[in-house]
Amino acid sequence: MDLRQLIRDIPDYPKEGILFFDITPLLGDPDGFRRAIDLLAERFADSGATKIVAAEARGFIFGAALAYKMGLGFVPVRKPGKLPYKTVSVSYDLEYGSDTLCMHEDALLRDEKVLVIDDLLATGGTLSGVIDLVEHFGADIVGIGVVIELEFLNGKEQLRSYGCESILQIA
């Protein structure tokens, strides 16, 4: 099954000059969605992970489904003000500015084995922020998995030491 056929290209969204890769056709196709989760599960079957950490919003979709498939806990990473309990936060740089991500202060244990999942790897900014949060807890990142990697943006370079895996590469 060619998962690329289930990703819709939308030019000039959310602003002019940006090519947006829409995953909703993949999510709407039961076989395609199942295949994406199965491929991620195969890649990380021997990772030793105990938790999956994923950032909102689209990372939740794949992270939660993969956690269910692998029998692991799921930890959401959200923007400030979106989690009800006490949080730990980290600010990180984006291509044009910065942003902040938060996790509950009791979400991870020291030395816990964590798999970080997201829908798309572009420049690596968001994933770097998630990594900083996970490492704040003293947890160990045993892998990073993404559905789509935009190879032309070289985001994988800054994640090299964590073993980033993608199931679909767009050059």
UniProtKB/Swiss-Prot annotation:
Pathway: Purine metabolism; AMP biosynthesis via salvage pathway; AMP from adenine: step 1/1. It catalyses: AMP + diphosphate = 5-phospho-alpha-D-ribose 1-diphosphate + adenine. GO terms for molecular function: adenine binding; adenine phosphoribosyltransferase activity; AMP binding. Belongs to the purine/pyrimidine phosphoribosyltransferase family. Its EC number is 2.4.2.7. Keywords: Cytoplasm, Glycosyltransferase, Purine salvage, Transferase. The lineage of its organism: Bacteria, Pseudomonadati, Thermodesulfobacteriota, Desulfovibrionia, Desulfovibrionales. GO terms for cellular component: cytoplasm. It is found in: Cytoplasm. The gene is apt. GO terms for biological process: adenine salvage; AMP salvage; purine ribonucleoside salvage. It is an enzyme of class 2 (transferase). Homodimer. This is Adenine phosphoribosyltransferase. Catalyzes a salvage reaction resulting in the formation of AMP, that is energically less costly than de novo synthesis.
